[in-house]
Regions:
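Conserved N-terminal alpha-helix of the aminotransferase class I/II PLP-enzyme fold
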Residues: 56-98, 287
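N-terminal "arm"/small-domain region of PLP-dependent enzymes with the aminotransferase-like
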Residues: 2-62, 190
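Active-site PLP attachment segment
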Residues: 212-244
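Conserved PLP-binding catalytic core of the aspartate aminotransferase-like
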Residues: 41, 282-288, 295-329, 351-353
Length: 369
């Protein structure tokens, strides 16, 4: 055995000993309380037909053929970015291959040596990875803690200051106090970056637009693989920001651009979203019903979103509860440490427009049995 292979095995054995080894699981026929397909777009026949109709109008090659800076650019890609900028009320838009690529490209390039990034302690791993690749000094502030952020911003700095948050947090499901944060950023001349991944579609065009603070946010990131049922992401900001990222965001420069099917899927999903108010209201109704049914149980985190999490400390304990739920043909997955801090392991329930109240009742009956 090669030394490198043994090192891999030893590392995996250590993780197994910590009861935190991840595995790929397939539950094909279970009722979905797991996916990020909040509006059901990933299974929508209407969206499928829209995409097929648009594909039939184009004779371009299937793949993009290269980076956007080489052979991978197209009129469809440019038109999509113009459409997305208008849709999200932004000056400019730049499409990335995924939300991960968008955050890594953005955070690794936007801040230089001497700059500072203050970030909510619960921001996504992709933001952490981007910050690690930057030359900026990066400091967390306590989750949604305005006072702690104020203390951070009071620190003297020589360079540019950025503040990074999510509008809806992926593990806890709660909202960032965006208006308070944006007011602080304006006061301290800090640039606010908001990841809208789990708000897009669930709350219309995102919480930034819902709260009418687009002009106060320096950068927004929207992803298309969740409520929009597609793939890819967009970074929204000024024309200067877009030009900068085209020149310096390595995850944009050094990768093959999205294929035609993905570009068309993104636009069609947005057009479907504009006429899917009833579907969005059905999701919001399910969220309201779920919160009513768990009211008073302090093990559930307080969340106004489609993400509802119940703390079950211990990797083995949360696995056992999820196994019981899965045996009833309900797809709920455990969230283990180190993905979340030790002692904060949980079941993470994702609600959808297509879930029925009977399915929700069945899930909660098993959880409490």
């Amino acid at each position: 055995m090669l030394p490198a292979e043994k090192a891999l095995q030893d590392t995996l054995s250590k993780r197994k000993g910590q009861d935190s080894l991840r595995k790929l699981v397939l539950l094909e026929k279970a009722i979905d309380f797991c996916s990020n397909d909040y509006l059901g777009f990933a299974r929508s026949q209407e969206l499928y037909q829209m995409i097929q109709e648009q594909l039939s109008l184009h004779e371009e090659r299937i793949g993009s053929g290269g980076s956007r800076l080489l052979s991978g650019n197209s009129k469809i890609a440019k038109d999509l970015e113009l459409y997305l900028a208008e849709f999200y009320n932004a000056q400019a838009a730049l499409v990335f291959n995924s939300g991960y690529d968008a955050n890594v490209g953005l955070f690794s390039s936007i801040a230089k040596k001497g700059d500072i990034i203050f970030y909510d302690e619960l921001v996504h791993a992709s933001i952490h990875d981007g910050m690690r690749l930057s030359k900026a000094d990066c400091f967390p502030f306590r989750h949604n803690d305005i006072k702690h952020l104020q203390e951070r911003l009071n620190q003297p700095t020589a360079g540019n200051v950025f503040v990074a948050v999510e509008s809806v947090y992926s593990m806890d499901g709660d909202w960032a106090p965006l208006k308070e944060i944006s007011a602080l950023c304006e006061k301290h001349k800090a640039s606010l970056i908001v990841d809208e991944a789990h708000a897009t579609g669930v709350f219309g065009k995102g919480l930034v637009q819902q709260q009418k603070i687009e002009s106060e946010v320096f950068v927004r990131v929207h992803t298309f693989g969740k409520a929009l049922g597609s793939h890819g992401a967009v970074v929204l900001g000024s024309a200067t920001l877009k030009e900068y990222l085209v020149n310096y965001a390595r995850s944009f420069i050094y990768t093959t651009a999205l294929p035609l099917h993905s570009l068309i899927s993104i636009e069609c999903a947005h057009r479907l979203l504009e006429k899917s108010v009833g579907v969005q209201n059905k999701l919001l109704d399910n969220i309201s019903y779920f919160k009513k049914m768990i009211a008073g149980n302090k093990r559930w985190l307080d969340s106004p979103s489609a993400i509802q999490s119940m703390i079950v400390p211990g990797n083995n304990e949360v696995r056992e509860l999820c196994k019981k739920i899965q045996d009833a043909d309900l797809d709920v997955r455990p969230i283990l440490s180190p993905t979340v801090p030790k002692g904060k392991e949980r079941i993470r329930v994702c609600l959808h427009a297509y879930n029925t109240k009977q399915e929700i009742d069945k899930l909660l009956e098993i959880v409490y049995s």
